[in-house]
């Protein structure tokens, strides 16, 4: 990214609106091929026929401008600006160009903010999705109610573009972005709005991911403001926030008005013990106070989505539960607050008393049924959890087959090592181990028992169960007692940045 900052500063110095000219820069598309963006959609299978031409990109952009979008006719669905070219490839290239360009100012701003806050060294640990669980273990045992929230998707891509317009002042760039989205919707006019946005997210993952993340960031920034000023808000006062520009321009004035003019009529709900966590499109809001406050926030969320983002969400999509009686699902774990009872003997002079102490602990367990469902979908077992052979891998060498199974088992063990109960984790390892043996036996056209007896592979396959112990022994080489204690306790690895396909079964 640093090697392109010189070009960006040059383009920025020439004119105020600097995003639009980047569309026609060769190095922007070269950036998509660099190692920094190796997750690009069109990088994976780049052959001779798929080598892009900047001249063709310019021609396609010109064609989008030349179409008259003010006149809608029956033949509009037949018009295709990508006619004569590789439609999917150049659609992805232009989408990738939009994504890269719009990421640049936010990436530079984010990098500078990290350096200013002096948290660059700890940034890698903060990025881990498992860094949230130590926070939950520390805070949630003292809370009583949890609200399970699924953030709704916008019904139209235009909503995502409008949100971004308030932060990036470049009218030509967004006009071209709208033309691109219009052409996409025009080519998929047979789809409903909900299916259309789902199709766009699959065919243009990078651009959609950026727009959606920005939408979530915007929603959370408004929520944090409401949380900070919650003692001055009532549900019937929410109508003053309808106009979004007015909201940002006058929010400080509104707070002063609330405090001065409505202090005698407002009902104050102060809740210092309220916590909010989110991963992807799901969030958890937990509080210690009565469910009345949680219901208040529930209606705030619904009105926020409807008024600011034109997203319809029914009250039934937000579930309020009691932590001691219900569990919530987050990042592949089921979590709930469990009561631990212990009896302490106390003696005073000649009298002995038994004192019962009740403490709360956050219980985090592996959801065995969803994982077995994911393993069955990947053809490692059937729906009942009985291991089966992975026939599609039978053409590989024995070493490759064992290595593939070991990597899957290692990743799942690494991810779920924070579980309170390891019995479910051992069952998953057993399924993968037996599936590996059956795959090898299928390859050699033998039974499982005959294959193990002939090849002596039983000791090699013990790695499925010894991998975790070897890692812990490297961390604590001399403390065997410590190793035994840690073997039954939770360990969170802060190098996990995302969940794999078998874990992501929502």
Swiss-Prot record:
Keywords: Chloroplast, mRNA processing, Plastid, RNA-binding, tRNA processing. GO terms for biological process: mRNA processing; RNA splicing; tRNA processing. The keyword Glycosyltransferase does not apply. It is found in: Plastid, Chloroplast. One of its GO terms (molecular function) is RNA binding. It comes from the Eukaryota. One of its GO terms (cellular component) is chloroplast. It holds the Pfam family MatK_N. InterPro entries: Domain_X, Maturase_MatK, Maturase_MatK_N. Usually encoded in the trnK tRNA gene intron. Probably assists in splicing its own and other chloroplast group II introns. Belongs to the intron maturase 2 family. MatK subfamily. This is Maturase K. It comes from Mimosa pudica.
